[in-house]
Amino acid sequence: MKTFLIFALLAMAATMATAQFDPSEQYQPYPEQQQPILQQQQMLLQQQQQMLLQQQPLLQVLQQQLNPCRQFLVQQCSPVAVVPFLRSQILQQSSCQVMRQQCCRQLEQIPEQLRCPAIHSVVQAIIMQQQQFFQPQMQQQFFQPQMQQVTQGIFQPQMQQVTQGIFQPQLQQVTQGIFQPQMQGQIEGMRAFALQALPAMCDVYVPPHCPVATAPLGGF
């Protein structure tokens, strides 16, 4: 009888131990407990964006400081020329060497944590210049032929109103549809290239990743 009671007690103890340490009942964070982590991440991202907005005036100054780097990138200096519409501007090797030295000198003077966003602002200025170069040609090809057809037979006082109502929305859609995706892709490609080429050329460290402004900064 005693033996039976002992076995019964041991079985009960084993059952209780199994229930207490059931792996399926281990602690798991609830969604309510995960919310503070997500909120902290969102706050950190907002702080980075606010810091970037505060740095924009400084980045515009650094953009001017890196003007030699911009000139070096757009000119036909070694294999660094990456802007198609400026490849005809070929410089002498001596001029390229001077420009390279000036670029490296200015890049070294910029604080390390600001080099990446400063290079990005230079790339944005180059792409904005490229957009300004091509957009008048696009406007001329799109606007003038259709304007000539529509304005025939329309009185001069009404012509300006009609052409503005017809062509300006279409022209805006065409230019936005062509330039905005293309410009964003060019910015990303040229930014990646510049973040590799300039540090290697100047033998300076530039962080490979940095928060960057999405809105175009002032050009040169």
Swiss-Prot record:
InterPro entries according to UniProt: Bifun_inhib/LTP/seed_sf, Bifunc_inhib/LTP/seed_store, Glia_glutenin
Pfam families xrefs: Gliadin
2 X 10 AA tandem repeats of M-Q-Q-Q-Q-F-F-Q-P-Q: region residues: 128-146
Signal peptide location: 1-19
Entry-linked SMART domains: AAI (SM00499)
Primary localization class, coarse: other
Sites bearing Pyrrolidone carboxylic acid, chain numbering: Q20
Cysteines engaged in disulfide bonds, as pairs: C69-C202, C77-C96, C103-C104, C116-C210
Spans annotated as 2 X 8 AA tandem repeats of Q-Q-M-L-L-Q-Q-Q: 41-56
Spans of repeat Sequence: 41-48, 49-56, 128-137, 138-146
Alphabetical keyword list: Disulfide bond, Pyrrolidone carboxylic acid, Repeat, Seed storage protein, Signal, Storage protein, Vacuole
Location(s), subcellular: Vacuole
Example GO molecular function: nutrient reservoir activity
Any one GO CC term of the record: vacuole
Quaternary assembly: Monomer.
Role: Seed storage protein. Serves as a source of nitrogen, carbon, and sulfur for the young developing seedling.
Homology family: Belongs to the gliadin/glutenin family.
Protein name as annotated: Avenin-3
